[in-house]
């Protein structure tokens, strides 16, 4: 038994949060078994419609009973090679039915899941596997033109802790011969013996909600990715944010286009599905034609999408006119500031409410829903500021979280409108600390130092407005400029498809503003035209870009975040 990932939070915190009803003895595997008992033969999970193009197999559709049976059989396969409580299982799989099964099977045994994006190659996998001491690794035999199981087998000797490597896929997708040391497993119905053995194991050694359930990874946009262990406690608390804001219920059909490797995919889609017992439709990798087709074919009621995609779709009325969107009632978006015209456009033209999310693997969860902010412009710009007197919000976590803004220079709490400061949070959604010997991310009062810069807004200070990552601020002549604000405005230009704002080094001013953009087809853009467009937005002159760079694409990591450090490096060069 690996004890390294057990008992993440101190007893005093567990006692406090359980006494307040924020945490309970419930674990993820218990939630799954409860849904199976209630839902039975109802549809649970659906494969990507284009699965045959990705792996060669036919898409699958499973009921809750079928899903449970295959989960039990897979758990038996893990158990047979000695995997158990506290072991870390590296997972690199696309969004399929089998990925759902791997997670649920591992958690039924107390195994810690560490998911990695499909885009990661041997270098990234080796680094994270050794950081987290993977005991086993599960992937797929093929994905497009890649052979992931073969890739892992080739670096196995460089991961001393790795005892087992699995290729998990339907029998039709498993090759006749796998690389040496790779065990092939296929979905199959559980035997009565496997069912009874798992029942005994769960009864005699149940999961502890304070034990690690996952080790996800920070995006590595600023430095080496950090491991983020999270227990059942934090996951089951934070999932209420992404259930309450879109008001997800058992009758919903969720379309998941985000890789299930971090907060966006796991908490944005997977856990709301599991907690409510609705239908989960998987999608991967992103393909706009398939995505829109799934919305129509599966009668999807809720999905998530990045702001750039929503803006692009809104500008292409002919594309949307060809799709039946009548079932779709809301869309989640976020990670970067939303453009008010985009949020307003979806609401006014299609009656679809866009929900603004801001989250992190560590446990940030700010959200603006139509229930709390009916005005789409407010919803794009602001988040509820929890704890303000005489203001109540619709989500459970708004009553659970403590939120502060702190001046990054003086360390003093900020209470006035319009003063930028670092967001710091405390509450039942927040993790216990990074994997390994990392500096503590918490301040002297136990609040998570997020590194995100916000300001208080609203007539009564009831809102928070995101400005930018602290490390991304451009400081021009002593004035702080938030790239995110500029990016949101530049993205409204009809020629701009994608944008990142960075600071160019300057000997006199310290930094000057540079805009790096990609353009829409058959458009052009000059710096003077962009500056004129921004002047019409009535922004301060010191924020205006002094350099415009046009690229074919912007560098992004595996989860879609722009790698500004690469843009800065090329700017310096």
What are these regions (language model features)?
Residues 25, 40-43, 166-167, 172, ...:
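Conserved pre-ATP/AMP-binding loop-to-beta segment of ANL
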Residues 331, 338, 342-357, 361-463, ...:
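Conserved AMP-binding/adenylate-forming
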């Amino acid at each position: 038994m690996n004890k390294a990932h057990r008992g993440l939070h101190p007893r005093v915190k567990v006692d406090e949060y359980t006494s307040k009803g924020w945490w309970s003895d419930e674990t993820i595997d218990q939630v799954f078994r409860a849904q199976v008992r209630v839902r039975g033969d109802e549809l649970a999970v659906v494969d990507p419609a284009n699965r045959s193009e990705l792996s060669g197999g036919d898409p699958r559709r499973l009921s809750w009973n079928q899903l449970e049976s295959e989960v039990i059989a897979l758990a038996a396969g893990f158990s047979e090679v000695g995997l158990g409580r506290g072991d870390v299982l590296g997972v690199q799989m696309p969004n399929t039915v089998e990925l759902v099964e791997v997670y649920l099977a591992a958690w039924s045994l107390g195994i810690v899941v560490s998911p990695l994006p499909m885009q990661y190659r041997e270098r990234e996998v080796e680094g994270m596997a050794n950081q987290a001491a993977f005991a086993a690794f599960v992937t797929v035999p093929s994905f497009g033109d890649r052979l992931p199981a073969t890739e892992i087998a080739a670096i196995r000797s460089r991961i001393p802790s790795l005892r087992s490597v699995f290729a998990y896929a339907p029998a039709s997708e498993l090759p006749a011969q796998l690389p040496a040391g790779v065990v092939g497993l296929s979905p199959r119905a559980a035997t009565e013996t496997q069912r009874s053995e798992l029942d005994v194991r769960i009864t005699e050694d149940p999961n502890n909600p304070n034990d690690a359930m996952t080790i996800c990874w920070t995006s590595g946009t600023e430095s080496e990715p950090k491991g983020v262990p999270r227990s059942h406690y934090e996951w089951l608390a934070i999932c209420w944010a992404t259930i309450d804001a879109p008001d997800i219920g058992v009758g919903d059909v969720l379309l998941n286009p985000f890789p299930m490797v971090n907060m966006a995919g796991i908490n944005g889609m997977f856990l709301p599905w599991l907690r409510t017992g609705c239908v989960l439709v998987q999608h991967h990798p992103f393909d706009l034609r398939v995505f829109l087709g799934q919305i129509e074919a599966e009668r999807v009621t809720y999905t998530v999408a990045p702001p750039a995609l929503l803006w692009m779709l809104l500008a292409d009325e002919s594309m949307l006119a060809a799709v039946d969107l009548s079932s779709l009632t809301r869309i989640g978006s976020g990670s970067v500031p939303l453009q008010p015209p985009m949020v307003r456009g979806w609401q006014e033209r299609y009656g679809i409410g866009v929900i603004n999310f801001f989250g992190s693997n560590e446990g940030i969860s700010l959200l603006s829903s139509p229930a709390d902010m009916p005005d789409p412009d407010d919803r794009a710009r602001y988040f509820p500021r929890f704890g303000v007197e005489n203001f109540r919000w619709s989500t459970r976590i708004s009553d659970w979280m403590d939120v502060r803004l702190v001046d990054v220079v003086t360390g003093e709490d900020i209470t006035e409108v319009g003063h930028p400061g670092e967001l710091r949070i405390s509450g039942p959604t927040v993790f216990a600390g990074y994997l390994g010997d990392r500096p503590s991310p918490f301040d002297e009062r136990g609040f998570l130092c997020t590194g995100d810069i916000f300001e208080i807004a609203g007539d009564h200070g009831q809102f928070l407005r995101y400005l930018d990552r602290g490390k991304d601020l451009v400081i021009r002549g002593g004035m702080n400029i938030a790239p995110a604000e500029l990016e949101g405005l530049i993205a409204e230009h009809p020629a701009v498809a994608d944008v990142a704002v960075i600071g160019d080094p300057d000997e006199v001013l310290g930094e000057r503003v540079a805009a790096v953009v990609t353009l829409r087809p058959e458009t052009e853009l000059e710096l003077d035209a962009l500056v004129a467009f921004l002047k019409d937005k009535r922004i301060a002159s010191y924020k205006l870009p002094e350099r415009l760079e046009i690229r074919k694409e912007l560098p992004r990591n595996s989860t879609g975040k722009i790698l500004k450090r690469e843009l800065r490096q090329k700017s310096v060069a």
